[in-house]
């Protein structure tokens, strides 16, 4: 088993469909549901979207633009395999699938939907709930 450590740089909540992402200093992950007060809470495989800062920088985006919940410092999260465990603060998440680029991305930047293929982010489900705070250590275990 390999382990990688990084840290949480941003946390966002989506309070309603189509609403702007709200930056927060911390969030509460709820086992089997997602993040408290996030509209995606309760979805089975799409509870939390995680992106890394390398992806944000590579495409010249602002944090929150990809509708991500959590941004991790550095690179290498995109393409994480299903079943990978990510410990964020007090919470433990499991990678369920990579997030496919959608039409919304071309509204942000022409061609982004095609360009970001394979780097859109990683969707997770919450295995163990807990508080997640900006600056917390993130431990990724394959």
Name these PLM-found stretches.
Residues 1-142:
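Metal-cofactor-dependent catalytic cores
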């Amino acid at each position: 088993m390999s382990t990688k450590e990084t840290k949480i740089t941003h946390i966002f909540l989506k309070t309603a469909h189509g609403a702007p992402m709200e930056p927060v200093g911390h969030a509460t992950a709820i086992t089997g549901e997602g993040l408290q007060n996030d509209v995606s809470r309760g979805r089975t495989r799409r509870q939390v979207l995680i992106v890394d800062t390398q992806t944000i920088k590579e495409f010249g985006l602002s944090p929150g633009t990809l509708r991500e919940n959590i941004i991790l410092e550095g690179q290498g999260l995109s393409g994480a395999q299903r079943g990978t465990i990510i410990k964020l603060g007090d919470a433990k998440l499991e990678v369920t699938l990579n997030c496919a680029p959608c039409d919304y991305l071309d509204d942000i930047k022409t061609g982004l939907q095609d360009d970001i293929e394979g780097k859109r982010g990683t969707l997770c489900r919450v295995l163990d709930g807990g508080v997640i705070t900006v600056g917390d250590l993130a431990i990724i275990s394959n």
